[in-house]
């Protein structure tokens, strides 16, 4: 009788999972099938096997990561570690901002001014190329909805001048943009454009050469321009400015204070500076980028995400698990498998790449990690996770050494992930 009830419950659970499109999988254990040892059914919270280990050693771990920060000249940083759907460790170090900030005592009304702001769990960092991973998530949501195909020709969707002049009969697809194999590179037109304000229209950028001369899909060449154009593709199929679509489709549903433009950050004083470089001095970013017509975006999506370590960890929970966070499905499991499927090998950094995701087995012996690194304005950052255990690490900085480890991962990222993983 018990077995019939158990099977009925299991069948109902499986059907419910298939109807939602996102399914929760048990990756931490196996079902024991000896009926003689079956106990009455009890619903328990998922076990977190290592969080107590981290809690018991938090002071030791804090001291170890602080020393790594010192060794690599980190200005300010924040770390968030998760398992399954829970953030189990967070820690911040150093200075987040050199911006003068006024503080008002809520009780006395006294106003004080501070020349620096220490980093904390709410500090928002510009995460540079980690942004590409989030842009790809947004594109893959649209792919699930049938609104965007990975096989779509970027020239047909965004701008006909993106047709490769060396291979006029070969299309450069959205998938090629995500794998850096499109033949569209950070050429003279692009590098000139990003150093100007107001930013020129895409037509102007394309007046100068931005093609590698290699057949689309045949060769790897890291391209910020290509991932920026994915933002333009998203605008074309949604009819919304990229920063608005990201806010409506991902950040607000997640309940996180993040954006590709600083204007949308609720607590703008929480945005980290890069030494003396202050993102708040860049002006009204929404207005500046808004001068580029909707559907012609070629910036933002490649590297302009501002987010805290804990909020990026929440996105990591989606990517490392079953696409679900707090009961809401953001990506289907088969989509995550597609994202994580190896496409190309980057010999310069010794990293295999999926869809806007880096894949490496050279940080932790015997563990394949997925994620991305960021490097801009002197800030080095990373997110790496293991889908097989649903564990991951976010490490964000506003300034650090760009030295590389033997693995070719940035040395500070390599050291932090190794240190954290000892407790996982």
What are these regions (language model features)?
Residues 18-33:
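Sec-dependent signal peptide cleavage junction
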Residues 54, 400-424:
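Short, gly/Ser/Thr-rich active-site loops of penicillin-recognizing serine hydrolases
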Residues 54-125:
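Short, conserved catalytic-motif segment at the N-terminal edge
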Residues 62-65, 85, 126-154, 230-235, ...:
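Active-site SXXK
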Residues 97, 104-108, 166-376:
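Short, surface-exposed loop or secondary-structure junction motifs
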Residues 149-166, 253-254:
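Short, glycine/proline-biased beta-turn/loop segments that scaffold the active-site neighborhood
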Residues 380-384, 389-400:
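Short, well-ordered beta-strand elements
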């Amino acid at each position: 009788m018990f077995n019939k009830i158990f099977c009925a419950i299991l069948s109902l659970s499986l059907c419910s999972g298939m109807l939602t499109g996102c399914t929760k999988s048990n990756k931490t254990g196996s079902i024991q099938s000896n009926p003689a040892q079956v106990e009455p059914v009890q619903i328990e919270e998922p076990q977190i096997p290592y969080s107590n280990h981290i809690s018991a050693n938090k002071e030791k771990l804090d001291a170890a990561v602080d020393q790594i920060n010192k060794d690599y000249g980190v200005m300010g940083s924040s770390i968030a570690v998760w398992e399954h759907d829970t953030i189990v460790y967070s820690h911040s170090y150093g200075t987040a901002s050199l911006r003068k900030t006024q503080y008002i005592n809520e009780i006395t009304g006294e106003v004080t001014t501070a020349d620096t702001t220490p980093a904390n769990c709410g500090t928002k960092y510009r995460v540079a190329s980690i942004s590409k991973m989030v842009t790809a998530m947004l594109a893959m949501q649209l792919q699930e909805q049938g609104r965007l195909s990975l096989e779509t020709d970027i020239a047909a969707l965004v701008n006909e001048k993106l047709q490769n002049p060396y291979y006029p009969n070969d299309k450069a697809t959205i998938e090629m943009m995500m794998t850096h194999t499109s033949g569209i590179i950070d050429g003279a037109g692009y590098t000139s454009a990003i150093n100007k304000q107001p930013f020129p229209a895409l037509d102007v950028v394309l007046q100068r050469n931005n093609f590698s001369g290699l057949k689309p899909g045949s060769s790897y060449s890291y391209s910020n321009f290509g991932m920026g154009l994915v933002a333009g593709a998203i605008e074309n199929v949604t009819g919304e400015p990229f920063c608005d679509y990201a806010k409506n489709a991902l950040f607000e549903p997640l309940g996180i204070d993040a954006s590709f433009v600083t204007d949308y950050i609720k607590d703008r004083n929480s945005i980290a500076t890069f030494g003396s470089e202050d993102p708040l001095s860049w002006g009204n970013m929404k207005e500046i980028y808004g001068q580029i017509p909707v559907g012609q975006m070629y910036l933002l999506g490649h590297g302009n995400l501002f987010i805290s370590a804990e909020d990026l960890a929440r996105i990591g929970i989606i990517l490392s698990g079953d696409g679900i966070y707090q009961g809401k499905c953001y990506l289907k499991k088969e989509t995550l498998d597609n994202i994580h499927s190896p496409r190309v090998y980057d010999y310069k950094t010794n990293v295999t790449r999926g869809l806007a995701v880096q894949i490496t087995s050279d940080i932790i012996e015997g563990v394949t990690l997925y994620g991305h690194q960021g490097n801009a304005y002197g800030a080095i950052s990373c997110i790496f996770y293991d889908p097989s255990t649903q564990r991951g690490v976010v490490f964000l900085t506003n300034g650090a050494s760009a030295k590389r480890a033997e693995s070719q991962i940035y040395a500070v990222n390599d050291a932090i992930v190794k240190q954290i993983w000892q407790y996982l």
